[in-house]
Structure formats: structure tokens, C-alpha cells
Amino acid sequence: MAQIDFRKKINWHRRYRSPQGVKTEHEILRIFESDRGRIINSPAIRRLQQKTQVFPLERNAAVRTRLTHSMEVQQVGRYIAKEILSRLKELKLLEAYGLDELTGPFESIVEMSCLMHDIGNPPFGHFGEAAINDWFRQRLYPEDAESQPLTDDRCSVAALRLRDGEEPLNALRRKIRQDLCHFEGNAQGIRLVHTLMRMNLTWAQVGGILKYTRPAWWRGETPETHHYLMKKPGYYLSEEAYIARLRKELNLALYSRFPLTWIMEAADDISYCVADLEDAVEKRIFTVEQLYHHLHEAWGQHEKGSLFSLVVENAWEKSRSNSLSRSTEDQFFMYLRVNTLNKLVPYAAQRFIDNLPAIFAGTFNHALLEDASECSDLLKLYKNVAVKHVFSHPDVEQLELQGYRVISGLLEIYRPLLNLSLSDFTELVEKERVKRFPIETRLFHKLSTRHRLAYVEAVSKLPSDSPEFPLWEYYYRCRLLQDYISGMTDLYAWDEYRRLMAVEQ
């Protein structure tokens, strides 16, 4: 296994800047401070304040949005990073691992990866993802990609339908159809950072948000050695060349992950498990007393001194015995969060250090907090109680169904843009107004300039005389629509759907 040297991983160069010479410790830190500024001031981060964490279209400011959740993940990520660096310092391994002058960048990459980890999520979270994927599957039928005879292919898009005697083109058609039917928030985050917003972040900072390493066009089983890392799509066909360059710059083998991404993932796991339960109490789905009962019942028999006793029971007892006139709810969750972090953060840090050779190589095929330990059991406890008593609550399910309908409806409303022929859509893009297409013209005007420019740039780079051109053009047209709708906030998507469906406000 390769020697651990983080100077080979924390690459401070950028895609759109000429390579620079040796930098001092302070100069490198300034480069990552620039990354922080670009990220924190980006509109993608601001939009998180009106995107769902658990409860869509929530007006209660005490209930978490994607932004407040991401800020909490950022703090936990910083805590884990500092714990790792502190332990490596005690072991006198900072210099040996090339981290003695990179502790600041190490922390900053983790923090900003945490803050950005949800920027690609569509309105209404996972139900928004499902709506996009279901809508495209019902038109592209990726499962028919291996149909025999080819006349059995049910794809409704002529350019992407399989044809006899066109095997090289059919291979591309299969990839495109599979890719478009696997929209995923993490993959969209990569697309946002690189293609749509051109943030030109350092290679190391982008590596921190490449959570999954499976291409969206992947078909079939994933390698056993990487089945966890390839659990979900991590990037699209449109970013394939960029990810190939990223792997080269970060010395990553195929389907391997950047080391600091494991820290971001652990911070997210720790943060949302407690937060979802607290939000459920805030929403009056259950009381603190009922929550404690649910947790106690789900954990089962335990002894004094067990992790459940030290974390959950301790929080419950302290919140009940507090002599100050304070909210029992607030006190319980404060102690529960503190107790949880005090146990899970050191454990995650030690797991990172214990498995550092595989993590540095990018091949550690697990999450830091998914093993046979009590710490892992505690996270599972929080998740299981949330699934059973929060996500299955009628109010939550109704909002999710409404969100699914909104996203499906918006895609259907904008469908005329996908129905235009290549020549007609090209004319609309060039002229921005075509008299014989009044509906399509007005729909096109509603698309954001950023997304339209990304489409134009991608298509302009394609050789127009190539037989692949119609396939790629349609692919980027679909991406244009997915980019626009997935970039909406929950409230904007809701209002836009009602406006375009002529529903009374």
C-alpha cells in the first residue's frame, strides 16, 4: 500500500488556473480561504434556506432547513477533523503523514465539504429525486436497453431509440438513457460546482464532496470491493472528463474516494439523526416523553453504564432534574446532542486513524460509523425511530406526495421543450422567440440564464456533423430541464406549479 502523504492529496491547484510553483504554508491556507469565500457566498448555499430537511414547506423557523442542517454538519465535521489532527499530533504522526503544514487546509476542506454536501438536492428531497427519475424512466425506458429484438424498445424519444445496424450509437444511447434516469443530489452537486456555477474550487475541495464513485450511467452489479462506495450515482456523463481529471489530480484509483470525504459523511450521519428527532418534537409529532419511550423500547434491555444509559438516559435524567426554569425539550436535546457527540466524534476519529491506509488509498469500503460497535447501534437506533415514527407520519407522507406531484407536474409542463425537433429547438435557442412556437417560447424564457448558457456551451463544443450530435444535444437538453427544476427551492417549485396550473393563490 502507498505511503501516507497528504501533500499528494491536498491539491490546492484549480481547473481554470495555470499550475503554480511551491507555496508557503500561509499561501496555501489563503487559497483554501478563497474556496471558503466562493462557497459561502454562492447562491447554491443561500437556496438551502428554502429547501427541505424533513418537513417540506415548513414555516416554523425553529424547524431545520437544508441550510441550518448543513451548518450543523459543518460544526461536527470541524470537531471530527480537529480530533483526528489532535490524536495524530499526540502520536507524533503529523509530519510523517505530511500534515504538519496542512492542518488548516485539512479542517477547511472538511468544513466546506460539510456545508456543500446537500447543494445538489432538488426540491422536496428524496421525493423530488424520485419524481425526476420516474418521469424520465416512463419516457426513456432504460430497462429496454438490452431488448431483443430492438423493435421491442419502448423509448419514446426517436433519437435515443435503439436501431439495427447502429451498435456504436446504440451503446451511447444506452449510456444516455441510464444516466438521465439516475438523477442524484450528490451527482448534481458536482455538476453545480463545476459546470453550472463555475466556482473553480481547488481539486481537493471538490474531492471532498464526491461522496459516491459510481457513474450515473452504470449498469449491472458493482465490484464487491467498492460496493459501498458505489452505492449511489456520484457523477453524470456530462462531468465524466472532469472527474477523470479530478482522479488524476488527487491520485485516486478508479472508483476510489477522497480521504476527507469519510469525515464529511460521518458528520452528516451524526447530525441528522438527532436533528430529525428534535424537529419531530418541534412539529408536535410526538412529545419528548414519547420519544424517550420510543428510544427505550427500540434499544431494549440494557445495563447501567451501557452506551444507551450514558447518552440517552443521562440526557433524560438531566433534563428532568434541572433546577432552572428551562424548557424540558430544549434541555433534553441539548444533553442528547452533547452526549452523542462526545461518544461518536472520538469514535469516528479513531476509526479514521485505525483505517487510514485504506482511507488514504480511497478504498475503505464502509462508512466510519457503520460497524458492529455500540456507537453504530446508537445511530441505527435514532434512524430506526425516525423511520418508524417520523417519516411514516401521515402529515409527512402527505407533504412528500404533494412534493412528488409538484416536481412531476413541472416536468410535464416543460415537456414541450423536449418534444421540439433538433432544428426547431436550435432555432429557439438562437432567436429566443419563434412565432410558430408560442408555448415553447414562453417556457424557454422561464429557464434561468445560467442553465441556458451551460446548455449552449456544452452543445457548441460538439461536432455538428457527427452522427452522435443529435444524441448529445438531446442529452444536454434534458440536463437543462433537470438543472432548472432541481435548482428550485421548495417554495418556488410549489408556487411555480400552482401558477402554471392556474390554481388560485
UniProtKB/Swiss-Prot annotation:
Positions of the HD domain: 66-273
Cofactor(s) listed: Mg(2+)
Any one Pfam family match given in the protein's UniProt record, by short name: HD
Keyword DNA repair attributed: no
InterPro entries: dGTP_triP_hydro_central_sf, dGTPase, dGTPase-like, dNTPase_1, HD/PDEase_dom, HD_domain
Group of enzyme by EC: hydrolase
EC number: 3.1.5.1
Keywords per UniProt: Hydrolase, Magnesium
GO MF, one example: dGTPase activity
PROSITE patterns: HD
SS bonds (residue pairs): none
Annotated Gene3D superfamilies: Hypothetical protein af1432, putative deoxyguanosinetriphosphate triphosphohydrolase like domain
GO-annotated biological processes: dGTP catabolic process
Entry superkingdom: Bacteria
Catalytic activity: dGTP + H2O = 2'-deoxyguanosine + triphosphate + H(+)
Quaternary structure and interacting proteins, as annotated: Homotetramer.
Family designation: Belongs to the dGTPase family. Type 1 subfamily.
HAMAP family to which the protein is assigned, alphabetical: dGTPase_type1
The protein's role, per its UniProt record: dGTPase preferentially hydrolyzes dGTP over the other canonical NTPs.
Protein name: Deoxyguanosinetriphosphate triphosphohydrolase
Species of origin: Escherichia coli O127:H6 (strain E2348/69 / EPEC)
